[in-house]
């Protein structure tokens, strides 16, 4: 005759499993801050890769260098009331694009890089509302909207990449050798990463989650090497 579990034994097992799950479950909770940092670092590296395989040099165009590939942080209001596409000025997002028009801004969905993980999407979460056609809206990538997707409330830029006025964002451009530049260049090779006293320094990007935890991303001058450090656990 086979022995069977009693009802009491089954209840005890269920209780033990429940207690174990209560301790284990938090370890599997989503870490928005680290996910955002990993994604940003990967896309900065991807921008550098695009710049190195897409040399923009053109002897017939004196402003050829303005077309280089750009990684751009911004929190400027798009004035387009679309769910998840920056409905207010405290909505951080970023774009990866080649400034083909030389306007210093992303003006067309076709200028944005294709998402290497999903070719139907572009590496932008929104830009000038006048350019957001129905086709463009389908290609927007909400994972690049850091506030909406990852609950990132603020981003600070220090050392080699001081933000523009009002801290509305920065631009990191890469040349054909993968070297990073800060902002909108006036010459082909200039505007290195330098701090307030003119010393060459890494670009330091600090993300702050809505719960107050922070994570820092560094982009090194000359090499463009990207590292993540000092990520708080929560």
What are these regions (language model features)?
Residues 1-32:
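N-terminal single-pass transmembrane signal-anchor helix
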Residues 32-65:
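Membrane-proximal N-terminal amphipathic helix
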